Protein backbone atom coordinates (compact mmCIF):
# COMPACT_ATOMS: atom_id res chain seq x y z
CA UNK A 1 0.00 0.00 0.00
CA UNK A 2 2.85 2.33 0.85
CA UNK A 3 4.44 1.64 -2.54
CA UNK A 4 1.17 2.59 -4.26
CA UNK A 5 1.10 5.98 -2.55
CA UNK A 6 4.72 6.56 -3.43
CA UNK A 7 3.94 5.81 -7.11
CA UNK A 8 0.95 8.16 -7.07
CA UNK A 9 3.13 10.91 -5.58
CA UNK A 10 5.78 10.49 -8.24
CA UNK A 11 3.14 10.61 -11.01
CA UNK A 12 1.69 13.83 -9.58
CA UNK A 13 5.13 15.45 -9.41
CA UNK A 14 5.89 14.46 -13.02
CA UNK A 15 2.53 15.82 -14.19
CA UNK A 16 3.14 19.12 -12.38
CA UNK A 17 6.61 19.39 -13.91
CA UNK A 18 5.31 18.78 -17.44
CA UNK A 19 2.45 21.24 -16.93
CA UNK A 20 4.78 23.96 -15.69
CA UNK A 21 7.06 23.51 -18.71
CA UNK A 22 4.10 23.66 -21.10
CA UNK A 23 2.87 26.85 -19.42
CA UNK A 24 6.31 28.42 -19.57
CA UNK A 25 6.71 27.61 -23.24
CA UNK A 26 3.28 29.09 -24.04
CA UNK A 27 3.67 32.19 -21.86
CA UNK A 28 5.82 35.22 -22.74
CA UNK A 29 9.40 35.03 -21.61
CA UNK A 30 10.39 36.85 -18.46
CA UNK A 31 10.84 40.60 -18.96
CA UNK A 32 8.95 40.58 -22.36
CA UNK A 33 5.47 41.97 -23.05
CA UNK A 34 5.09 39.94 -26.29
CA UNK A 35 6.54 39.61 -29.81
CA UNK A 36 8.97 42.40 -30.58
CA UNK A 37 8.02 44.51 -33.61
CA UNK A 38 9.21 47.66 -35.35
CA UNK A 39 6.70 50.49 -35.54
CA UNK A 40 6.35 53.81 -37.29
CA UNK A 41 3.72 56.25 -38.50
CA UNK A 42 2.55 57.39 -41.91
CA UNK A 43 4.95 59.89 -43.46
CA UNK A 44 4.56 62.44 -46.21
CA UNK A 45 6.71 61.45 -49.17
CA UNK A 46 6.93 62.29 -52.85
CA UNK A 47 5.22 59.54 -54.78
CA UNK A 48 5.03 59.01 -58.52
CA UNK A 49 2.35 57.44 -60.66
CA UNK A 50 3.80 55.38 -63.49
CA UNK A 51 2.59 53.70 -66.66
CA UNK A 52 4.54 50.67 -67.89
CA UNK A 53 4.64 50.18 -71.66
CA UNK A 54 6.67 47.71 -73.77
CA UNK A 55 8.59 49.31 -76.60
CA UNK A 56 11.01 48.70 -79.45
CA UNK A 57 14.26 50.52 -80.22
CA UNK A 58 13.98 52.28 -83.60
CA UNK A 59 15.60 54.95 -85.72
CA UNK A 60 14.17 58.37 -84.97
CA UNK A 61 14.16 59.13 -88.67
CA UNK A 62 14.61 56.66 -91.50
CA UNK A 63 14.06 56.42 -95.23
CA UNK A 64 13.09 53.46 -97.39
CA UNK A 65 13.70 53.57 -101.14
CA UNK A 66 11.54 51.16 -103.15
CA UNK A 67 11.76 50.21 -106.82
CA UNK A 68 9.30 52.35 -108.84
CA UNK A 69 8.43 50.71 -112.13
CA UNK A 70 6.66 53.81 -113.48
CA UNK A 71 9.98 55.67 -113.47
CA UNK A 72 11.57 53.23 -115.89
CA UNK A 73 14.53 50.89 -115.59
CA UNK A 74 16.73 51.06 -112.50
CA UNK A 75 20.10 51.98 -113.96
CA UNK A 76 22.46 52.37 -111.00
CA UNK A 77 22.61 52.09 -107.21
CA UNK A 78 25.05 54.78 -106.15
CA UNK A 79 25.59 53.78 -102.50
CA UNK A 80 26.57 50.65 -100.60
CA UNK A 81 25.85 49.35 -97.12
CA UNK A 82 27.63 51.39 -94.44
CA UNK A 83 28.00 54.56 -96.54
CA UNK A 84 27.38 57.88 -94.78
CA UNK A 85 24.92 60.07 -96.66
CA UNK A 86 23.73 63.63 -96.34
CA UNK A 87 20.40 65.11 -97.29
CA UNK A 88 20.39 65.36 -101.08
CA UNK A 89 22.90 62.56 -101.73
CA UNK A 90 22.04 60.62 -104.92
CA UNK A 91 20.98 57.05 -104.09
CA UNK A 92 19.67 55.46 -107.31
CA UNK A 93 19.11 56.52 -110.91
CA UNK A 94 16.60 55.34 -113.54
CA UNK A 95 16.59 55.42 -117.33
CA UNK A 96 13.35 56.02 -119.24
CA UNK A 97 13.40 55.86 -123.06
CA UNK A 98 9.80 57.00 -123.36
CA UNK A 99 10.56 60.06 -121.26
CA UNK A 100 13.57 60.86 -123.44
CA UNK A 101 11.36 60.70 -126.54
CA UNK A 102 8.76 62.94 -124.93
CA UNK A 103 11.45 65.44 -123.99
CA UNK A 104 12.81 65.49 -127.55
CA UNK A 105 9.29 65.86 -128.96
CA UNK A 106 8.67 68.77 -126.61
CA UNK A 107 11.81 70.53 -127.81
CA UNK A 108 10.71 70.15 -131.43
CA UNK A 109 7.22 71.44 -130.63
CA UNK A 110 8.71 74.45 -128.86
CA UNK A 111 10.91 75.26 -131.86
CA UNK A 112 7.90 74.90 -134.16
CA UNK A 113 5.85 77.28 -132.00
CA UNK A 114 8.61 79.88 -132.05
CA UNK A 115 9.01 79.61 -135.82
CA UNK A 116 5.28 80.03 -136.29
CA UNK A 117 5.27 83.16 -134.13
CA UNK A 118 8.25 84.57 -136.06
CA UNK A 119 6.49 83.91 -139.38
CA UNK A 120 3.32 85.64 -138.22
CA UNK A 121 5.38 88.57 -136.97
CA UNK A 122 7.00 88.87 -140.42
CA UNK A 123 3.56 88.83 -142.05
CA UNK A 124 2.40 91.63 -139.74
CA UNK A 125 5.45 93.69 -140.72
CA UNK A 126 4.71 93.07 -144.39
CA UNK A 127 1.10 94.09 -143.78
CA UNK A 128 2.27 97.37 -142.24
CA UNK A 129 4.29 98.08 -145.39
CA UNK A 130 1.31 97.22 -147.56
CA UNK A 131 -0.86 99.60 -145.52
CA UNK A 132 1.57 102.47 -146.02
CA UNK A 133 1.51 101.91 -149.79
CA UNK A 134 -2.32 101.89 -149.80
CA UNK A 135 -2.40 105.15 -147.87
CA UNK A 136 -0.67 106.83 -150.79
CA UNK A 137 -3.36 105.58 -153.16
CA UNK A 138 -6.67 105.63 -151.21
CA UNK A 139 -5.91 107.55 -148.01
CA UNK A 140 -5.28 106.46 -144.43
CA UNK A 141 -8.85 105.56 -143.39
CA UNK A 142 -9.56 103.51 -146.48
CA UNK A 143 -6.20 101.77 -146.18
CA UNK A 144 -6.89 100.80 -142.55
CA UNK A 145 -10.32 99.52 -143.56
CA UNK A 146 -8.93 97.29 -146.30
CA UNK A 147 -6.12 95.92 -144.08
CA UNK A 148 -8.15 95.54 -140.83
CA UNK A 149 -9.56 92.04 -141.40
CA UNK A 150 -6.22 90.63 -142.52
CA UNK A 151 -4.40 92.19 -139.55
CA UNK A 152 -7.04 90.86 -137.12
CA UNK A 153 -6.61 87.37 -138.54
CA UNK A 154 -2.82 87.51 -138.20
CA UNK A 155 -3.01 88.85 -134.65
CA UNK A 156 -5.38 86.01 -133.73
CA UNK A 157 -2.96 83.48 -135.22
CA UNK A 158 -0.09 85.02 -133.28
CA UNK A 159 -2.05 84.90 -130.00
CA UNK A 160 -2.93 81.25 -130.60
CA UNK A 161 0.71 80.42 -131.35
CA UNK A 162 1.85 82.18 -128.16
CA UNK A 163 -0.66 80.16 -126.10
CA UNK A 164 0.59 76.96 -127.70
CA UNK A 165 4.17 77.98 -126.84
CA UNK A 166 3.19 78.52 -123.19
CA UNK A 167 1.56 75.09 -123.10
CA UNK A 168 4.72 73.58 -124.55
CA UNK A 169 6.80 75.35 -121.89
CA UNK A 170 4.56 73.95 -119.16
CA UNK A 171 5.00 70.48 -120.63
CA UNK A 172 8.76 71.07 -120.70
CA UNK A 173 8.74 71.94 -116.99
CA UNK A 174 6.68 68.84 -116.20
CA UNK A 175 9.11 66.69 -118.19
CA UNK A 176 12.06 68.34 -116.42
CA UNK A 177 10.52 67.39 -113.07
CA UNK A 178 10.03 63.81 -114.23
CA UNK A 179 13.63 63.69 -115.45
CA UNK A 180 14.78 65.04 -112.08
CA UNK A 181 12.78 62.28 -110.36
CA UNK A 182 14.83 59.69 -112.22
CA UNK A 183 17.53 60.41 -109.64
CA UNK A 184 16.31 59.48 -106.15
CA UNK A 185 18.06 61.42 -103.38
CA UNK A 186 18.42 60.97 -99.66
CA UNK A 187 15.85 62.89 -97.63
CA UNK A 188 17.81 62.57 -94.37
CA UNK A 189 21.35 62.48 -93.03
CA UNK A 190 22.42 59.05 -91.84
CA UNK A 191 23.95 55.69 -92.73
CA UNK A 192 22.98 53.18 -95.41
CA UNK A 193 21.70 50.27 -93.33
CA UNK A 194 21.02 47.88 -96.20
CA UNK A 195 21.07 47.57 -99.99
CA UNK A 196 18.83 44.88 -101.52
CA UNK A 197 19.95 44.01 -105.04
CA UNK A 198 17.13 41.49 -105.51
CA UNK A 199 14.54 44.17 -104.83
CA UNK A 200 16.32 46.35 -107.39
CA UNK A 201 16.14 43.63 -110.03
CA UNK A 202 12.47 42.86 -109.21
CA UNK A 203 13.25 39.20 -108.37
CA UNK A 204 11.41 39.33 -105.05
CA UNK A 205 7.69 38.52 -105.01
CA UNK A 206 7.15 40.74 -101.96
CA UNK A 207 8.04 44.38 -102.41
CA UNK A 208 11.05 45.17 -100.26
CA UNK A 209 13.12 48.34 -100.04
CA UNK A 210 16.10 48.67 -102.34
CA UNK A 211 17.82 50.95 -99.82
CA UNK A 212 17.24 51.54 -96.11
CA UNK A 213 18.77 54.61 -94.45
CA UNK A 214 18.82 55.43 -90.74
CA UNK A 215 20.89 57.31 -88.18
CA UNK A 216 22.35 54.99 -85.49
CA UNK A 217 23.12 58.03 -83.34
CA UNK A 218 19.50 59.15 -83.29
CA UNK A 219 17.40 56.37 -81.77
CA UNK A 220 14.01 56.35 -80.05
CA UNK A 221 11.88 53.75 -78.31
CA UNK A 222 8.38 53.41 -79.73
CA UNK A 223 5.37 51.63 -78.30
CA UNK A 224 1.59 51.74 -78.11
CA UNK A 225 -0.74 53.16 -75.46
CA UNK A 226 -4.19 51.94 -74.50
CA UNK A 227 -7.15 54.32 -74.54
CA UNK A 228 -6.93 54.56 -70.75
CA UNK A 229 -3.18 55.26 -70.61
CA UNK A 230 -3.25 57.83 -73.40
CA UNK A 231 -5.26 60.11 -71.09
CA UNK A 232 -2.38 60.12 -68.59
CA UNK A 233 0.71 60.15 -70.78
CA UNK A 234 1.80 63.56 -72.09
CA UNK A 235 4.69 64.91 -74.12
CA UNK A 236 7.68 65.84 -71.95
CA UNK A 237 7.06 63.33 -69.13
CA UNK A 238 10.11 61.53 -67.73
CA UNK A 239 10.74 57.90 -68.66
CA UNK A 240 12.99 55.19 -67.22
CA UNK A 241 13.99 52.48 -69.70
CA UNK A 242 15.09 48.93 -68.91
CA UNK A 243 15.88 45.88 -71.01
CA UNK A 244 15.80 42.14 -70.29
CA UNK A 245 18.62 41.69 -72.81
CA UNK A 246 20.92 44.40 -71.40
CA UNK A 247 20.48 43.63 -67.72
CA UNK A 248 21.57 45.79 -64.80
CA UNK A 249 21.33 49.06 -66.73
CA UNK A 250 18.73 51.79 -66.99
CA UNK A 251 18.38 54.74 -69.35
CA UNK A 252 16.55 58.02 -69.00
CA UNK A 253 14.32 59.63 -71.58
CA UNK A 254 11.29 61.80 -72.17
CA UNK A 255 8.04 61.29 -74.03
CA UNK A 256 8.64 63.01 -77.39
CA UNK A 257 5.33 62.20 -79.11
CA UNK A 258 1.90 60.77 -78.34
CA UNK A 259 -0.37 60.01 -81.30
CA UNK A 260 -3.54 62.08 -81.61
CA UNK A 261 -5.25 59.29 -83.54
CA UNK A 262 -5.03 55.49 -83.20
CA UNK A 263 -2.43 53.52 -85.09
CA UNK A 264 -3.87 53.11 -88.60
CA UNK A 265 -2.80 49.49 -89.02
CA UNK A 266 -4.19 48.57 -85.61
CA UNK A 267 -7.45 50.37 -86.37
CA UNK A 268 -7.83 48.59 -89.71
CA UNK A 269 -7.20 45.21 -88.08
CA UNK A 270 -9.67 45.96 -85.30
CA UNK A 271 -12.57 46.93 -87.56
CA UNK A 272 -15.54 44.71 -86.88
CA UNK A 273 -13.92 43.22 -83.77
CA UNK A 274 -13.89 43.98 -80.06
CA UNK A 275 -10.17 44.81 -80.01
CA UNK A 276 -9.24 48.01 -78.21
CA UNK A 277 -7.54 50.72 -80.25
CA UNK A 278 -3.97 51.71 -79.47
CA UNK A 279 -2.15 55.01 -79.85
CA UNK A 280 1.48 55.36 -81.00
CA UNK A 281 4.03 56.52 -78.43
CA UNK A 282 7.62 57.68 -78.93
CA UNK A 283 10.30 58.23 -76.27
CA UNK A 284 13.52 60.19 -76.87
CA UNK A 285 16.55 58.73 -75.08
CA UNK A 286 18.72 61.13 -73.06
CA UNK A 287 22.47 60.77 -72.61
CA UNK A 288 24.31 57.66 -73.75
CA UNK A 289 22.37 55.44 -76.13
CA UNK A 290 21.81 51.73 -75.35
CA UNK A 291 24.27 49.24 -76.81
CA UNK A 292 21.34 47.48 -78.46
CA UNK A 293 20.40 47.61 -82.12
CA UNK A 294 17.12 48.73 -83.68
CA UNK A 295 14.56 46.04 -82.93
CA UNK A 296 15.68 45.45 -79.32
CA UNK A 297 12.82 45.32 -76.81
CA UNK A 298 12.58 47.72 -73.85
CA UNK A 299 10.24 48.43 -70.97
CA UNK A 300 9.23 52.09 -70.59
CA UNK A 301 8.24 53.26 -67.10
CA UNK A 302 6.57 56.62 -67.71
CA UNK A 303 6.25 59.00 -64.75
CA UNK A 304 2.79 60.46 -65.28
CA UNK A 305 2.30 62.22 -61.91
CA UNK A 306 4.50 63.29 -58.98
CA UNK A 307 3.01 64.60 -55.72
CA UNK A 308 3.21 64.55 -51.93
CA UNK A 309 1.20 61.83 -50.17
CA UNK A 310 0.91 59.99 -46.84
CA UNK A 311 2.79 56.73 -47.24
CA UNK A 312 3.95 53.60 -45.46
CA UNK A 313 6.61 51.11 -46.47
CA UNK A 314 4.92 48.70 -48.86
CA UNK A 315 5.84 45.69 -46.69
CA UNK A 316 3.72 47.14 -43.84
CA UNK A 317 0.54 46.80 -45.91
CA UNK A 318 -1.11 43.39 -46.18
CA UNK A 319 -4.07 42.20 -48.23
CA UNK A 320 -6.88 39.76 -47.60
CA UNK A 321 -9.17 39.15 -50.56
CA UNK A 322 -9.84 42.68 -51.86
CA UNK A 323 -9.20 44.44 -48.55
CA UNK A 324 -5.91 46.08 -47.63
CA UNK A 325 -5.00 46.40 -43.95
CA UNK A 326 -2.19 47.14 -41.50
CA UNK A 327 -1.48 46.29 -37.88
CA UNK A 328 -1.22 49.11 -35.37
CA UNK A 329 -0.03 48.81 -31.77
CA UNK A 330 -2.47 49.85 -29.06
CA UNK A 331 -2.13 49.02 -25.35
CA UNK A 332 0.62 46.52 -26.12
CA UNK A 333 -1.46 44.56 -28.60
CA UNK A 334 -1.59 44.32 -32.39
CA UNK A 335 -4.77 45.73 -33.88
CA UNK A 336 -5.88 45.14 -37.45
CA UNK A 337 -6.93 48.35 -39.22
CA UNK A 338 -8.45 48.33 -42.72
CA UNK A 339 -7.04 51.01 -45.00
CA UNK A 340 -7.69 52.45 -48.44
CA UNK A 341 -4.58 52.71 -50.57
CA UNK A 342 -3.61 54.78 -53.60
CA UNK A 343 -0.46 54.56 -55.70
CA UNK A 344 1.95 51.71 -55.04
CA UNK A 345 5.68 51.78 -55.84
CA UNK A 346 8.37 49.21 -55.12
CA UNK A 347 9.05 50.76 -51.70
CA UNK A 348 6.07 52.91 -50.73
CA UNK A 349 2.29 52.59 -50.62
CA UNK A 350 0.01 55.61 -50.47
CA UNK A 351 -2.46 55.51 -47.55
CA UNK A 352 -5.63 57.44 -48.37
CA UNK A 353 -7.92 56.44 -45.50
CA UNK A 354 -7.86 54.50 -42.23
CA UNK A 355 -4.87 55.96 -40.34
CA UNK A 356 -3.79 59.16 -38.61
CA UNK A 357 -0.32 60.56 -38.02
CA UNK A 358 -0.51 59.38 -34.39
CA UNK A 359 -1.15 55.72 -35.18
CA UNK A 360 1.84 53.45 -34.57
CA UNK A 361 1.94 50.94 -37.40
CA UNK A 362 3.87 47.67 -37.36
CA UNK A 363 6.33 48.11 -40.22
CA UNK A 364 7.50 44.50 -40.41
CA UNK A 365 4.48 42.30 -39.68
CA UNK A 366 5.26 38.61 -40.03
CA UNK A 367 2.67 36.00 -40.88
CA UNK A 368 2.51 35.12 -37.16
CA UNK A 369 1.15 38.55 -36.18
CA UNK A 370 -2.59 38.41 -35.54
CA UNK A 371 -5.27 40.80 -34.34
CA UNK A 372 -5.12 41.09 -30.51
CA UNK A 373 -1.70 39.50 -30.19
CA UNK A 374 0.58 40.96 -27.51
CA UNK A 375 3.53 42.77 -29.06
CA UNK A 376 6.43 44.88 -27.90
CA UNK A 377 7.66 47.87 -29.91
Curated annotation (Swiss-Prot):
PANTHER family reported in the protein's UniProt record: EFFLUX SYSTEM COMPONENT YKNX-RELATED (PTHR32347:SF14)
Organism of this sequence: Bacillus subtilis (strain 168)
Swiss-Prot/TrEMBL keywords: Cell membrane, Coiled coil, Membrane, Transmembrane, Transmembrane helix
Gene Ontology CC terms, in alphabetical order: plasma membrane
Subcellular location: Cell membrane
Protein name in UniProt: Putative efflux system component YknX
Coiled coil among keywords: yes
Family as reported in the entry's similarity comment: Belongs to the membrane fusion protein (MFP) (TC 8.A.1) family.
Biological role stated in the UniProt entry: Part of an unusual four-component transporter, which is required for protection against the killing factor SdpC (sporulation-delaying protein).
One Pfam entry name: HlyD_D23
NCBIfam families with a match to the protein in the record: RND_mfp
Conditions for induction: Expressed in exponential-phase cells.
Subunit structure: Part of a complex composed of YknX, YknY and YknZ. The complex interacts with YknW.
Coiled-coil segments: 95-187
Amino acid sequence: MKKVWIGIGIAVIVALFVGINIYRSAAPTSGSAGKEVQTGSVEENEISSTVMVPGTLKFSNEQYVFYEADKGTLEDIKVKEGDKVKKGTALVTYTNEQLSLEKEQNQLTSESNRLQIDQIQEKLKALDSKERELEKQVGKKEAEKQIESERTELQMQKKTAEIELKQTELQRQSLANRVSDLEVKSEIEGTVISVNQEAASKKSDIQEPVIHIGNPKDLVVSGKLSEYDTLKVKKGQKVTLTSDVIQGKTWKGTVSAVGLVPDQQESAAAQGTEQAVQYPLQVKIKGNLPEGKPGFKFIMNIETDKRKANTLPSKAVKKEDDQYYVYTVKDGKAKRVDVKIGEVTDDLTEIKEGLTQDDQVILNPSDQVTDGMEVKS
